[in-house]
Regions:
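Alpha/beta-hydrolase fold nucleophile elbow
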Residues: 53-69
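Conserved loop-alpha-helix segment in the C-terminal half of the alpha/beta-hydrolase fold
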Residues: 191-223
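Active-site loop signature of alpha/beta-hydrolase-fold enzymes
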Residues: 18-21, 97, 192
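Active-site nucleophile elbow and catalytic-triad environment of alpha/beta-hydrolase enzymes
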Residues: 153-174
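Alpha/beta-hydrolase active-site loop
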Residues: 30-51
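Alpha/beta-hydrolase-fold enzymes
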Residues: 68-70, 74-157
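Conserved alpha/beta-hydrolase
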Residues: 2-24
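Short beta-strand/loop motif that positions the catalytic acidic residue
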Residues: 178, 184-186
Length: 223
């Protein structure tokens, strides 16, 4: 409603195995490569253009992409592979680097790759202690959505999925070139999520802000 009041035609996309796109028996959030989402984004753009057909001549529209967390990583890679598609990109706390930092990511990459090869759907250790959900609840910003869309401690994650994330982050670290201007939003501070702290309601307790800021300098020339 906020964007519509500003005159935008706002579309929310739930990628495969998330939210409204979840189907019975699926492994929540699992993909073996972030490139798999290209088909989802293409289908969404086709649907948007079909709805706008006939109105485009009267009021041509620019495409502004918005992504958060994993969606921010996914959109960064997609926009770099599809020059000329987006007029601008907005990234809200994009997961451009692993919480271990670049050195830690490189150190564990061989182990993650081996597990992804031999046991892609195995279970990774649980790292979500529920503090993100608690912080949202205390602020009154916890989305009113079906319980199955996001459990309190998140969904289990799998080696194949983590390998896909780390491959995307390695690509970002090597540098990509999004040709559109990119606006990156980050918290000013990071709070470790190992123990609950009231600061989690006003800082980022998921992403290491300084690492994300450094990674963001490698996604384009207008960031």
């Amino acid at each position: 409603r906020f964007w519509n009041r500003l005159g935008a035609r706002f579309y929310a996309l739930d990628l495969r195995k998330y939210g409204r796109s979840m189907r019975q028996g699926q492994t929540p959030g699992y993909v073996a490569s972030l490139d798999e989402y290209d088909a989802d984004i293409a289908a969404a753009l086709d649907a948007m253009r079909a709805r706008s057909r006939g109105r485009a001549r009267r009021s041509p529209r620019r495409l502004v992409l918005m992504g958060h967390s994993t969606g921010g990583l996914t959109l960064s890679l997609w926009a770099a592979r599809h020059p000329g598609e987006a007029a601008a990109v907005v990234l809200n706390s994009p997961w451009l680097e692993l919480q271990t930092g670049a050195i830690g990511r490189q150190a564990i990459a061989p182990l993650v790759a081996a597990r992804a090869r031999f046991d892609p759907l195995g279970t990774n250790p649980v790292v979500d202690l529920g503090f993100y959900t608690r912080a949202q609840r205390e602020l009154g910003t916890l989305p009113d959505s079906p319980e199955g869309w996001r459990p309190e401690r998140g969904f289990p994650t799998h080696p194949g999925w983590l390998a896909a994330i780390m491959t995307g982050q390695r690509t970002i670290a090597a540098g990509v070139d999004i040709d559109a201007p990119v606006f990156v939003l980050l918290s000013t501070r990071y709070t470790s999520p190992m123990h609950w702290a009231p600061a989690m309601t006003s800082t980022d307790s998921v992403l290491v802000v300084d690492d994300i800021a450094r990674a963001a300098t490698r996604i384009g020339r207008r960031v």
